[in-house]
Amino acid sequence: MNFINETNEEKKNKTNDDDALMQKFLNTRQIILAGEINKELSEKIVRQLLLMESLSATKPIYIYIDSPGGDADAGFAIFDMIRFIKAPVYTIGMGLVASAASIILLAASKERRFGMPNSHYLIHQPLSGIKGVATEIEIHAKELEKMRVKINKLIAEETGTDEKKVAKDTDRDCWLNAKESVEYGLISKIAKNRKDIPEK
């Protein structure tokens, strides 16, 4: 019985710590986007964006991204919300920014996109693990092609890179380090410390 009580108390303390940490992030208008991008993470990030906008539609929001990617639709939900809210949003790449995460990175305007010195980036065509009858595979293949074209067009528009080059680059995994990402147009600058990122 004592063990259960202690466990419940530990859970309560952890919840309180998490709530305090979340409040700290809300106050400083910082969002950590880490791990696989899925519906659950998308809903969490969207809620935080809407909440921060309700607190101030003029103060900037900073999203730190470290993600191997995941569901493209969940990524586009975050992308659209970043574009939807009035508050200016900065995206900062750290660690790995891959696949759907790179799309979220591009939601901020180019001058508001940064990368940390050791960050690296992966852009590629959407992947499919579909199995089933031939007609289902054919339908899915058509949707996948639409998604591929949409992503290539978005990358081209946001980086200033020719769409044909983007299509060629993303036909296979295209890895870029921080310096190469600046040259490609994914980010505008390498942020070595906090003062490299504007506060307003």
From Swiss-Prot:
InterPro entries: ClpP, ClpP/crotonase-like_dom_sf, ClpP/TepA, ClpP_His_AS
Pfam families found in the cross-reference section: CLP_protease
EC number(s) per entry: 3.4.21.92
GO function terms (MF aspect): ATP-dependent peptidase activity; ATPase binding; serine-type endopeptidase activity
Catalytic residues as annotated in Swiss-Prot or TrEMBL: S99, H124
Compartments where found: Cytoplasm
SUPFAM superfamilies reported for this sequence: ClpP/crotonase
Record key words, sorted: Cytoplasm, Hydrolase, Protease, Serine protease
Catalytic activity reported: Hydrolysis of proteins to small peptides in the presence of ATP and magnesium. alpha-casein is the usual test substrate. In the absence of ATP, only oligopeptides shorter than five residues are hydrolyzed (such as succinyl-Leu-Tyr-|-NHMec, and Leu-Tyr-Leu-|-Tyr-Trp, in which cleavage of the -Tyr-|-Leu- and -Tyr-|-Trp bonds also occurs)
Coiled-coil ranges per UniProt: none
Gene3D superfamilies: 2-enoyl-CoA Hydratase, Chain A, domain 1
Enzyme class (EC, first level): hydrolase
GO terms of biological process kind: protein quality control for misfolded or incompletely synthesized proteins
GO cellular component: cytoplasm; endopeptidase Clp complex
Keyword Secreted: no
Assembly and interaction partners: Fourteen ClpP subunits assemble into 2 heptameric rings which stack back to back to give a disk-like structure with a central cavity, resembling the structure of eukaryotic proteasomes.
Similarity section: Belongs to the peptidase S14 family.
Function: Cleaves peptides in various proteins in a process that requires ATP hydrolysis. Has a chymotrypsin-like activity. Plays a major role in the degradation of misfolded proteins.
NCBIfam families named among the record's database cross-references: PRK12553.1, PRK14512.1
Protein name: ATP-dependent Clp protease proteolytic subunit 2
Organism: Treponema denticola (strain ATCC 35405 / DSM 14222 / CIP 103919 / JCM 8153 / KCTC 15104)
